[in-house]
Each structure stands twice: as structure tokens, then as C-alpha cells.
Amino acid sequence: SDVKEFLNKLRDHCTKKGVLLIFDEIMTGFRLSSRGGAGLFQITPDLVTYGKVLGGGFPIGAVGGKKHIMETKHVFYGGTFSANPLSMYAAKLILEAIINETYIKYDQLDTAGQTFRDELNNYFILHDKKIRAIGCGSINRIIFTDRFIMNRKDRDLYEPTNAQSMFSESLRDHNVFVNGNGLYHFSMSHTSEVIRKLIGNIKRIC
């Protein structure tokens, strides 16, 4: 893909120049794969940040990296939520579930996301709607343009200003709450029945 090609070039360039490649995987970490976006695109960063999924709903943030970098210099960092026992225990259980594949099934999440996007896009194209479902793995978004977009700048350029907020309000009228950022993050709790109901509501609104 274009993204994978870009990341590979970025990895090569950073290596040649002696610059650390840092991935922000706060959103994508443990969502796109057990190694996040780095695993999905088969790129090894030097440092990576994690959050959200890692805490299983509790506040958390973590930094990981290659051993020789992490051991270069020890840093003391204190904060209100630092090393919170409940968050740490939740993270332990999450990591165990990912490593042992006891609960989180990435192939199932990927299939759910792809089905969501394919079915909606087929509907939008069939009915000549300037709307598309985009995303990667279990991360999805509805965009109100049929133009190809690669980033936030493209979306802001092609998508009507109030489209997302109006759409979210309409979904709430159908008892569907979408996060303020407009992203649909599917989890193992979202059954096929729940996703089909979501697809049906989106079709009715659009």
C-alpha cells in the first residue's frame, strides 16, 4: 500500500541519518494488530507510545522501544496517574489476553471492519451518494465526500463543514452514540448483530 511504502522509506531514511523513528500508537496500538500499526505494516520503530486499549478503559500511557535505547538513560517521571495500581493490573490482563489470544481475535475484528465498509460503500455507490466508509482493520469512519482522501487536510478540504455533527445528531436519534472524533472503533463486544443494526441505521439516515 501507499502507507506501507511511505513508512518503509521513512524507516530507511531514519536509519541512514541516525534519527530515531517514533510511532504514536495511542489510537492504533493493539487495535490494528497485536503490534499495532507497526505490526500491520511490518515496520519496526525505535520508540513507540501506547495508551487507550492498553488500559482496558482505565487511564494509561506507556512508552516502549528497542532495548539499547530504553536502557541508555533512566528517567524519573511522576504524575497523578503514574503507575496507578488498577490501570497496571488492567494492562497486565490486556497484554495476557493479546499474547495468549484468549479473547482478542484480530481476524474477527478485521472482518467486521471490512464488512462494515464494503456493505456501506456498495450502498452509497448504488444510490449515487457522495459518502464513503473508510478505515483500516477495526477503525472506521464515514466521510461525506466521494473523493479519495489520505489525511485530515484532504478531509477538511472535501467534506462539508457541518456534515459530521449533523450525522452524529441523526444517529443519536436512532440510539447510536458516536464519539466526537467520528471514529467507529469495533471491539470484541460488538457482535455481528450490533454491527448489522449500525449499518441499517446509517443506511436509513443517508
What is each PLM-predicted segment?
Residues 1-206:
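Conserved N-terminal phosphate-binding loop of PLP-dependent enzymes in the Aspartate aminotransferase
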